[in-house]
Design a protein with these regions (language model features):
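Catalytic cores of nucleic-acid ligases and guanylyltransferases
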Residues: 1-209
């Protein structure tokens, strides 16, 4: 069942934007690039003191990731909707899906925030991605134990992808500058996976998440 079908009206959670798969990063200017971390896609919703962490399939993982909940609760705005990835890292600082998959590691999960969809009642979905990123950076500022910004790279996506593969990351996601936020699969978000990453070898990963 989809997130759109399972979410109650008024909850303030939307179906996330999904990157389109590609064999190589887009070339030329007009794109920003980010590391794709191997974790659980999360929509983090805060309304006053209430925080919800919802997966892309509509599962409520709020109780599973207490550190992320605490961090979201500590941010300065009263109401917002963040898009991100909950991860648990190994001793090398690499996100490992098998660690977050098992509930015994949930207390260590950190939210990697990469988009801001709503802020204090303002719908930002039609706002260009670079402006949403700036507003997100103002919201998630300074060291936080349970939430960090996903670093953004501009320039040659092939170079970042090569580094991501060397480090053992899942891959990268490239996003077109000026693009808006749209639920479902988007041609303006492009993902390229490291062929040697565990995520590529894992069967039915999307069914679990």
């Amino acid at each position: 069942m989809s997130l759109r079908e399972r979410t109650r009206p008024g909850l303030g959670i939307i179906e996330p934007c999904l990157p389109s798969p590609a064999k190589a990063p887009p070339s030329g200017p007009g794109w920003l690039h980010e590391i794709k971390h191997d974790g659980v896609r999360i929509m983090a919703r805060r309304d006053g003191a209430r925080v919800r962490l919802i997966t892309r399939h509509g599962n409520d993982f709020t109780a599973r990731f207490p550190l992320a909940v605490e961090a979201v609760s500590a941010l300065s705005a009263r109401s917002f909707l963040l898009d991100g990835e909950a991860i648990v890292t190994n001793e090398r600082g690499l996100a490992v899906f098998d660690l977050i998959r098992h509930q015994r590691h949930g207390d260590d999960a950190v939210l990697i925030a990469f988009d801001l969809i709503e802020l204090d009642g303002e719908d930002l979905r039609r706002t260009p991605i670079e402006q949403r990123k700036r507003q997100l950076a103002k919201l998630v500022r300074g060291p936080q134990a349970g939430i960090v910004l996903n670093e953004v790279f501009e320039g040659d996506g092939d170079i970042l992808f090569a580094h991501a593969c060397k480090l053992g990351c899942e891959g990268i996601v490239s996003k077109r500058l000026g693009s808006t936020y749209r639920s479902g699969r988007s041609p303006h978000w492009v993902k390229v996976k490291n062929p040697k990453a565990p995520a590529v070898k894992r069967e039915a990963e999307e069914d679990w998440r």
